[in-house]
Amino acid sequence: MLVAATLGTSFSCVCPPCEAPGAQGAKPAAVVPVGSRLVVWDGEGGGIEGGKSWADCDKKGACKATLAPAPKLGKDSTNGLKFHAEGEGWQGAGWNWFGWWPETAGTDFRSYTHLTLWIKVTPKTPELAPEPGALGFLFGCSAGKKSSGSVVLGKYDKNLFDGQWHKVTVPLADFYVGKEGAEFDPGTAWEFRLNHWAGAPRNFDVILDDVAVEKQ
């Protein structure tokens, strides 16, 4: 199923991008990087406003995938962003911090070097935890609606699946490798995505908080 969640808006949207009803006038400018850290999600108004989410899975009728703001589930009992995955096969979701509008919106990542985020992975039971090598993270850009290369989050923290909060740091260069990474435009980044695949049924939540790009 494909579902969408919104934050601070009165209409819904699903992936692929759609135009806001009644949108008129000049398009807002892209977010210009300022300083050494740019937050795209913190759930408390410190990120980029107007974001929306999508979620989907490939075993229709036997899988679930959702991504939505989750009050009090963040790192400091603030608002987290919860990805729920259930069933076998592929589940994926994304948070577009522009809400897909305007279609040419984007944030310029080129002056930043690293992604940082806080993450907590909680399975329904231990045997239903995600595959350690199968929980991926990637970006999307508005230019050509391309995806970056995907990284395996477990590679950057060997204890990622212990049910506790972890700060994960990933060099942005890791997203720019391979064919997809070469086609991705870091000058128009506008979405981050999670994905997972397993051959056996899984049931788990991933909570994200304080998602940012930094100069390190």
Task: Identify the function of each model-found stretch.
Residues 1-10:
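Bacterial N-terminal signal peptides
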Residues 14-16:
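Bacterial signal peptide processing site
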